[in-house]
């Protein structure tokens, strides 16, 4: 990826990085790569056990 227009403030960049990280985690959950819940209120990810191991 290339970074263009670095005129954003550090706070803006942190928010973008957090949102990008959230999207990556969400995609991994949807793809079944990890089992987790995202609490958007506090920005935390709770990892769950793989339900397949109990079948």
UniProtKB/Swiss-Prot annotation:
Functional summary from the UniProt entry: Component of the COP9 signalosome complex (CSN), a complex involved in various cellular and developmental processes such as photomorphogenesis and auxin and jasmonate responses. The CSN complex is an essential regulator of the ubiquitin (Ubl) conjugation pathway by mediating the deneddylation of the cullin subunits of SCF-type E3 ligase complexes, leading to decrease the Ubl ligase activity of SCF. It is involved in repression of photomorphogenesis in darkness by regulating the activity of COP1-containing Ubl ligase complexes.
SUPFAM superfamilies tied to this protein: Winged helix' DNA-binding domain
Family membership: Belongs to the CSN3 family.
Every PCI domain range: 1-52
Annotated localization: Cytoplasm; Nucleus
Listed GO biological process terms: red, far-red light phototransduction; ubiquitin-dependent protein catabolic process
Gene that this polypeptide is encoded by: CSN3
An annotated GO cellular component: COP9 signalosome
The protein, known as: COP9 signalosome complex subunit 3
Pfam family, one: PCI
Keyword Nucleus set for record: yes
Self-association state and partner proteins as the record states: Component of the CSN complex, probably composed of CSN1, CSN2, CSN3, CSN4, CSN5 (CSN5A or CSN5B), CSN6 (CSN6A or CSN6B), CSN7 and CSN8.
Organism of this sequence: Brassica oleracea
Domain of life: Eukaryota
Keywords, in A-Z order: Cytoplasm, Developmental protein, Nucleus, Phytochrome signaling pathway, Signalosome
């Amino acid at each position: 990826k290339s970074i263009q227009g670095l005129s954003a403030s550090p706070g803006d960049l942190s928010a973008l990085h957090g949102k990008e990280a959230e999207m990556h985690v969400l995609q991994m959950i949807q793809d079944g790569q990890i089992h987790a819940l995202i609490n958007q209120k506090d920005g935390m990810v709770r990892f769950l056990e793989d339900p397949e191991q109990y079948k």
